[in-house]
Amino acid sequence: MASAGSGMEEVRVSVLTPLKLVGLVCIFLALCLDLGAVLSPAWVTADHQYYLSLWESCRKPASLDIWHCESTLSSDWQIATLALLLGGAAIILIAFLVGLISICVGSRRRFYRPVAVMLFAAVVLQVCSLVLYPIKFIETVSLKIYHEFNWGYGLAWGATIFSFGGAILYCLNPKNYEDYY
């Protein structure tokens, strides 16, 4: 700090690095993809005769034009999948808010580690849900027709990958990369 007689004050400036901005964008994209995955009607589809989402399961017999739908919230594994996915999404939302607030606050560095830890925790929860879902689906639902995991399931994987990328970016120490800025 400069002496009081010189009239100069030391001002600390915290530089926002591009890595953290890209990390925040990754977190935002993960949130958007999670929202799309949770609301998606198509996690599993089968030849326009069956579809399964996180909320309902619908079948249409080949001879009829009427869909018969029932809630999936009666099955333990589907509730567990939904809870893990929503838990991960909630953690991602908190990490996004902390990351966004850290941009507005002068001391950003102290928020980097908590955001990264939250994102890694969210990734673990979401990977567990995304591994549990196909295993239990194949184990419990017997379809005699070709079925495929559809775009809702893919969006959930996309959210998990973007969360992992954001966590990695928040782990990088900008002090080691000052030459690049």
Swiss-Prot record:
Tissue spec: Expressed in adult brain, fetal brain, cerebellum, heart, lung, prostate and thyroid.
Membrane topology value: Multi-pass membrane protein
Coiled-coil region list: none
Recorded GO CC terms: adherens junction; cell-cell junction; plasma membrane
Membrane spanning residue stretches: 21-41, 83-103, 115-135, 152-172
InterPro entries assigned to the protein according to its UniProt record, in alphabetical order: P53_induced (IPR015664), PMP22/EMP/MP20/Claudin (IPR004031)
Biological process annotations from GO: cell-cell adhesion
Pfam family of the protein (one): PMP22_Claudin
Assigned keywords, A-Z: Acetylation, Cell junction, Membrane, Transmembrane, Transmembrane helix
Subcellular location: Membrane; Cell junction, Adherens junction
Modification type N-acetylalanine: residues: 2
Superkingdom: Eukaryota
Protein family according to the UniProt entry: Belongs to the TMEM47 family.
General function of this protein: Regulates cell junction organization in epithelial cells. May play a role in the transition from adherens junction to tight junction assembly. May regulate F-actin polymerization required for tight junctional localization dynamics and affect the junctional localization of PARD6B. During podocyte differentiation may negatively regulate activity of FYN and subsequently the abundance of nephrin.
Subunit structure and binding partners: Interacts with CTNNB1, CTNNA1, PRKCI, PARD6B, FYB1.
Protein name: Transmembrane protein 47
Protein source organism: Homo sapiens (Human)
Source lineage: Eukaryota, Metazoa, Chordata, Craniata, Vertebrata
Gene: TMEM47
